[in-house]
Amino acid sequence: MKSLEYYRSQPKADVHTHLNLSMKYERYKQWSGVVIPNFPRKMRGLDEMHEIIGEYTRPQCKTAQDVLNLFTMSIEDAIADNVVVMETSVDIGFITHYEENLDHFLCDLSDLHRRYKRNVTLHFELGISKIRERSFVEQWAEPMMRSGIFENIDLYGPEISEGIEDFIYIFKLAEKYHLKKKAHVGEFSDAQSVRHFVEIFNLDEVQHGIGAATDENVLRFLAERKVRCNVCPTSNVMLNAVECLEKHPIKKMMDAGVRVGLGTDDLLFFGKTNSEQLFDMVSCGLITELHAEALLAVR
């Protein structure tokens, strides 16, 4: 079996990350001076994760410089894992840390592109939460999309279908500015919710999407539409979306012809790089080395 060092040595993509939470805990602890008890640890779903964010991480991020420091740590830890393509979500709300100075915000992102371009290709995606005030999104989404800094859009938040029609306008804007369209669904929700989100938003990619594995028809639908699911196995286990790594549906999805990419999601919380995830999945028999090579090849 190929070693962990082999997977670390291979160039790879990380196609599902959140840029403010994608550094290793040790680096974050050194920067913030904050020790999170019993961490990283398996959690009781997103509610417990958000409790930790509210108590330990959000209070440490107050200024534009704090945001930039977090982003920088995340990018450097990705590079250390030989990530050469990083698709990473930047929440629209960080404009408030920049005192609503859009030029300053965009300039910092542009500078990150330039600073690290020899090591990694960064694809910034505009992250928008479903619980964000609509007036705020309407104020900032279009100028951010129009800037050319963002290549993708990512809608996240509660995985419920009720009221999602309210977000169609965001994806129409994304189409206007030629952004790739993503949304979080199927992490805890079912196969039909995955199909519904893909259809109503005309998604190019799904963030997670593992709920689709319970329905062969939905897997076929995703495969036929060539919709990629950006799956985060360790995150799914740590948040109790999946009982254990051995029971993760990533292989079933790949074998059904669904395009699958691999992501760390929030490295700070889940503690496994993509190299480590590949090694762990092969080691436990979840996937074969051929599956691992296919995931390494994704860009």
Swiss-Prot record:
The UniProt record lists the EC number as 3.5.4.-
The UniProt record gives the binding positions of substrate as 18, 157, 266
**What Gene Ontology biological process does one annotation of this record name?**
nucleotide metabolic process
Q: What does this protein do?
A: Putative nucleoside deaminase. May catalyze the hydrolytic deamination of adenosine or some similar substrate and play a role in purine metabolism.
| Catalytic residues of the enzyme | 187 (proton donor)
Q: Which Pfam families match?
A: A_deaminase
In its UniProt entry, what is this protein called?
Answer: Putative adenosine/adenine deaminase
This protein's cofactor list reads:
Zn(2+)
- Could you say which residues bind Zn(2+) here? 16, 18, 184, 265
Question: What are this entry's molecular-function GO terms?
Answer: deaminase activity; hydrolase activity, acting on carbon-nitrogen (but not peptide) bonds, in cyclic amidines; metal ion binding
User: What family does this chain come from, according to its entry?
Assistant: Belongs to the metallo-dependent hydrolases superfamily. Adenosine and AMP deaminases family.
UniProt keyword annotations, A-Z: Hydrolase, Metal-binding, Nucleotide metabolism, Zinc
Swiss-Prot/TrEMBL site (Important for catalytic activity) positions: 208
What class does this enzyme belong to in the EC scheme?
hydrolase
**InterPro entries given in the database record:** A_deaminase_dom (IPR001365), Ado/ade_deaminase (IPR006330), Metal_Hydrolase (IPR032466)
Domain of life where this protein originates: Bacteria
Give me the comment on cofactor binding: Binds 1 zinc ion per subunit.
State the gene name recorded for this protein. add
* PANTHER family named in the record: ADENINE DEAMINASE (PTHR43114:SF6)
